Regions:
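Surface-exposed interfaces of beta-sheet-rich extracellular modules
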Residues: 27-63, 143-180
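Extracellular/surface recognition and adhesion modules
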Residues: 1, 34-35, 45, 84, ...
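Short, solvent-exposed loop/edge segments of extracellular or virion-exposed proteins
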Residues: 1-15, 53-55, 63, 96-104, ...
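Conserved "repeat-terminator" motif of extracellular CCP/Sushi domains
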Residues: 70-91, 97, 187-204
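Extended low-complexity, serine/threonine- and proline-enriched intrinsically disordered segments
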Residues: 1-2, 47-49, 109-117, 161-165
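Short strand-edge motifs at loop-to-beta-strand transitions and within beta-strands
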Residues: 18-22, 66-68, 80-82, 133-138, ...
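Tryptophan-paired
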Residues: 1-33, 112-148, 152-153
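Surface-exposed coil/turn segments at beta-strand junctions on protein surfaces, enriched
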Residues: 15, 23-27, 63, 75-77, ...
């Protein structure tokens, strides 16, 4: 432990904050606390802890028990600064359009831009029976609430439109608010979606 310990430090995203400096001595070992978050969800972030001097045993800032050995050489750095860096977890999003058998080529479907993402897909349209997608996948952030627009187009009322989403080929962390693609629906991007390609398909 330390003869002198730092106080609790609170910080609001996205504001960098510094605690009050305390005096430490060569030969001491500091136990670094696990970061907590309230309000908010710590699971939506990766937290990396780093120190500019001394010997650090671990870098996961969400884990308890990381220690910093204050070596004689480390005392040449004053103050020794340990930084917790939070990086939002991300995924990607692409929309797709599929048609069932007996779809008419004279019909069409238009799917507007999503909203609520760090980045959003753009409007695209396609003729009946022709598969399409929104183009290159866009990067979104865990915690985003994505709003999917209602599908529109020629003779859309003649079809049932089902909206479904997959993350990396499996289930998304959270469920869609609804599956009727002819009305607006939402999906909250969860921590379990981190690093995955999310594809949401409107099927007529």
């Amino acid at each position: 432990g330390l003869i002198n310990n730092t106080a609790v430090l609170n910080s609001t995203a996205s504001t960098n904050s510094n605690g009050v400096t305390v005096t430490v001595f060569a030969g001491e070992t500091a136990t670094l606390p696990a970061e907590t978050m309230s309000p908010g969800a710590l699971a939506n972030y990766t937290t990396t802890v780093s120190c500019d001097a001394g010997t650090l045993t671990g870098t996961n800032g969400q884990s308890a028990g990381n220690t910093l050995a204050i070596t004689a050489a480390a005392t040449a750095t004053s103050p020794i600064t340990c930084t917790y860096t939070n990086t939002p977890k991300t995924a990607t999003l692409q929309l797709a359009k599929a048609w069932g058998a007996n779809s008419s080529a004279s019909d069409s479907a238009s799917i507007g831009a999503t909203t609520g993402g760090t980045n959003n897909t753009t409007l695209f349209s396609t003729a009946g029976g022709t598969a399409a997608n929104s183009g290159a996948a866009v990067a979104i952030t865990v915690g985003n609430t994505i709003t999917f627009p209602a599908e529109t187009g020629t003779n859309i009322g003649n079809y049932n439109t089902v909206l479904s989403c997959l993350a990396g080929g499996g289930a998304t962390a959270n469920t869609l608010s609804g599956t009727n693609g002819q009305v607006s629906n939402t999906l909250v991007i969860g921590a379990g979606d981190s690093g995955k390609a999310i594809v949401c398909t409107y099927t007529n």
